[in-house]
């Protein structure tokens, strides 16, 4: 099965909600905040550079793994920093894990795949690192490779 891996440099960023404002004529319109648009453009650039322009087939089930590495604040003690790097402490701060996933998956719409509805398995983790980044892996999966829960479905 086909797999694409790429890295987005810098601290992870979550997808901000759309802003709705009133126009001078009394109507309303929504727009995506500039920070979100810039981050999604960075994701697209990183994908293009590292993917050899692979586009997964329409309807192809996909497994996506996202590992977000958060920066360690400079004022952190040596002991605490070591614990963070050894995964004895995890980032329990913003951005939320689901908003990071949303920014990655939405940015790849119509670029890596037709729509993120093709993602049938999503695995995500948050860690600390001296080199903040987001690592993404997209893998085409066959229906026979999908694992089902061990409990019975009703």
State where each predicted segment sits:
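Conserved small/polar residues in nucleotide/adenosyl-binding loops
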Residues: 144-150
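Beta-rich nucleic-acid/ligand-interaction surfaces
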Residues: 121-132
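Histidine-centered catalytic/metal-coordination loop motif
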Residues: 1-122, 137-142
């Amino acid at each position: 099965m086909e797999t694409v891996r790429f890295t987005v440099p810098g601290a992870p960023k979550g997808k901000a909600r759309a802003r709705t404002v009133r126009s001078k004529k009394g109507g309303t319109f929504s727009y995506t905040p500039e920070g979100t648009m810039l981050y999604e453009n960075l994701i697209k650039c990183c994908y293009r550079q590292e993917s050899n322009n692979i586009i997964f087939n329409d309807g192809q089930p996909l497994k996506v793994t996202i590992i977000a590495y958060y920066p360690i604040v400079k004022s952190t003690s040596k002991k605490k920093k070591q614990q963070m790097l050894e995964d004895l402490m995890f980032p329990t701060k913003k951005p939320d894990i689901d908003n990071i996933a949303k920014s990655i998956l939405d940015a790849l719409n119509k670029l890596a795949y037709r729509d993120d509805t093709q993602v049938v398995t999503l695995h995500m983790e948050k860690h600390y690192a001296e080199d903040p980044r987001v690592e993404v892996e997209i893998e085409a999966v066959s229906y026979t490779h999908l694992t089902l829960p061990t409990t019975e479905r009703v």
